[in-house]
């Protein structure tokens, strides 16, 4: 069988009582699990060109997830607008308990096909997200997945369920 991707690192935690509410994670819990996955994979955030986010388009959850990603990425440098931020939910809707694996499959297929699909229906970023002053970009057009196999890392797949990360 052909191997399309390898999970290099994993981070797991449970933010329990620190959650914003039952349906929204805590910023610190999200940042910790992203940091754990990067450390486990032994890669720098700056080497990652694509993040498959949980991205439910909620007014509370997305800003928390974005702030956690930004907090972690900014520890590695101040480079701006180089990492594509996307979510499979714009393509297929929320798949409930299969949402994490759907995002992971999208990330693997993106790597395999060399294309990052555009975020369909994206028009405006949430007012609580400062995209311009961040490492991230959101695109509504397909983009080539440009990577160098000699880089430390070239993809990050994020399940977003219960503070789980895979690199």
Predicted regions and their residues:
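Condensing-enzyme catalytic core of the thiolase-fold
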Residues: 1-167
């Amino acid at each position: 069988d052909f191997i399309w991707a390898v999970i290099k690192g994993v981070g797991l935690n449970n933010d329990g009582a620190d959650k914003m509410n039952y349906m929204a994670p805590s910023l610190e819990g999200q940042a910790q699990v992203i940091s754990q996955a990067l450390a486990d994979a032994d890669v720098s955030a700056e080497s990652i060109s694509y993040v498959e986010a949980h991205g439910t388009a909620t007014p509370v959850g997305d800003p928390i997830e974005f702030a956690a990603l930004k907090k972690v990425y900014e520890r590695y440098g101040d480079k701006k607008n180089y990492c594509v931020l996307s979510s499979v939910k714009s393509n297929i809707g929320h798949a409930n308990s299969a949402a994490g694996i759907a995002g992971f499959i999208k990330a693997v297929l993106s790597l395999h096909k060399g294309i990052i699909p555009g975020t369909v229906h994206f028009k405006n970023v949430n007012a609580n997200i400062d995209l311009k002053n961040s490492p991230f970009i959101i695109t509504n057009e397909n983009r080539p997945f440009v990577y160098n196999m000699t880089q430390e890392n070239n993809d990050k797949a994020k399940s977003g369920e219960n503070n789980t990360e895979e690199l």
